[in-house]
UniProtKB/Swiss-Prot annotation:
Encoding gene, per UniProt annotation: TNNT3
Organism: Homo sapiens
GO CC field: cytosol; troponin complex
InterPro entries documented for this protein: TNNT, Troponin, Troponin_sf
Entry-linked SUPFAM superfamilies: Troponin coil-coiled subunits
Biased composition (Acidic residues): 1-23, 35-47
GO biological process: positive regulation of calcium-dependent ATPase activity; regulation of ATP-dependent activity; regulation of striated muscle contraction; skeletal muscle contraction
Pathology noted in the entry: Arthrogryposis, distal, 2B2: A form of distal arthrogryposis, a disease characterized by congenital joint contractures that mainly involve two or more distal parts of the limbs, in the absence of a primary neurological or muscle disease. Distal arthrogryposis type 2 is characterized by contractures of the hands and feet, and a distinctive face characterized by prominent nasolabial folds, small mouth and downslanting palpebral fissures. DA2B2 inheritance is autosomal dominant.
Function: Troponin T is the tropomyosin-binding subunit of troponin, the thin filament regulatory complex which confers calcium-sensitivity to striated muscle actomyosin ATPase activity.
Protein known as: Troponin T, fast skeletal muscle
List of residues that carry N-acetylserine: 2
A GO term, aspect molecular function: calcium-dependent protein binding
Amino acid sequence: MSDEEVEQVEEQYEEEEEAQEEAAEVHEEVHEPEEVQEDTAEEDAEEEKPRPKLTAPKIPEGEKVDFDDIQKKRQNKDLMELQALIDSHFEARKKEEEELVALKERIEKRRAERAEQQRIRAEKERERQNRLAEEKARREEEDAKRRAEDDLKKKKALSSMGANYSSYLAKADQKRGKKQTAREMKKKILAERRKPLNIDHLGEDKLRDKAKELWETLHQLEIDKFEFGEKLKRQKYDITTLRSRIDQAQKHSKKAGTPAKGKVGGRWK
């Protein structure tokens, strides 16, 4: 039998079952007793309705209905649907796994790119540091070379001075000795002024007073430093002005033909 014939037979059986159920319901309704509350209880005769005639399903001639075949086809259909659900589930699972693998690959790729960028950045920074170190070494070498050339020029100039060279060295040593003596005196004065700060035995109020006193002293020292700086600037300005006046006077005296006193060989004449 074909699938269409099997479905037709199934529909006929279903219609037959529905007709039987409707007939049973009608039969029950007909046989229900009608209760009437009156002075005299009389039971009416039950009226029976004619039952519908049931007709057997039409079976095609020459063919028999194989219910096992129908059941088998239903099972096969259910199995096919179940298999389709299983296949779709595994396909979705496979797709999720592929997406997860792709995501991990993207993460690893991004991590590798970031590491490469950091390596390139570190290499550029290292090259920059090396370049700065080379420039610094080159500048130091040039400065040392320039100082050596200046020293050589000074030595040549001093050697050309002849007899005045020894006196110049003596005066230079004398000035160096004076500077050393002045530095020692300064250290001695500072050592006398810089007294040890013993504040372990002081309380909170005395510490506050001591801090205030130190702050006032520091403030006064800053004022004195500023005043001395301004005084030094004025003195330098006065010296520069006097030197320019002396130079102008010497120029005028040379033009007039009168000898002028000048500094020759490090000595005033």
